[in-house]
Amino acid sequence: MGSKVVIYTDGACAGNPGPGGWGALLQFNDTSKEVFGYELDTTNNRMEITAALEALRMLKKSCNIEIYTDSKYLQQGITAWIHNWIKNNWCKSNNEPVKNADLWQKLYAELSKHTIIWKWVKGHANNSGNIAADKLAVQGRETAIEILKCRG
């Protein structure tokens, strides 16, 4: 496996659902890259998953990765729940469809390319990487809000 990359991800939403943004900070050696994006009508959980997905898509080769997220939903979903979802054809134990299955499936497809350790970090608790990812997610959310204002 290749180089070590540290990634911090976050999602933000104005309302749930509502306009939302995602952000990620990727750190490799002494360099870093910030990325963010938005959706005009989404949920906070979709933005959390999208942040991780888009960060992984930025990587051009196999890497050893530590991903830090303040979303228990993302961290638990990708490390614990997803195995049963796959076994149950993307249904939960009560036979209801898994929410956000489209994004979970895309994220799962990215996992095989890398060695990944998923870590939960408390949000808004003076972790510089998490703070940076949060700012990027808010930037995405604010972009979505401005676009919606322009549309009237």
UniProtKB/Swiss-Prot annotation:
Single GO BP term: DNA replication, removal of RNA primer
Enzyme nomenclature, EC number: 3.1.26.4
Main location: cytoplasm
Listed cofactors: Mg(2+)
Positions that bind Mg(2+) 1: D10, E48, D70
Any one of the GO CC terms: cytoplasm
Domain RNase H type-1 intervals: 1-142
GO molecular function, one term: RNA-DNA hybrid ribonuclease activity
Reactions it catalyzes: Endonucleolytic cleavage to 5'-phosphomonoester
Residues that bind Mg(2+) 2: D10, D134
Keywords: Cytoplasm, Endonuclease, Hydrolase, Magnesium, Metal-binding, Nuclease
CDD domains: RNase_HI_prokaryote_like (cd09278)
Manner of cofactor binding, per the entry note: Binds 1 Mg(2+) ion per subunit. May bind a second metal ion at a regulatory site, or after substrate binding.
Role according to the record: Endonuclease that specifically degrades the RNA of RNA-DNA hybrids.
Name of the molecule in the record: Ribonuclease H
Gene that this polypeptide is encoded by: rnhA
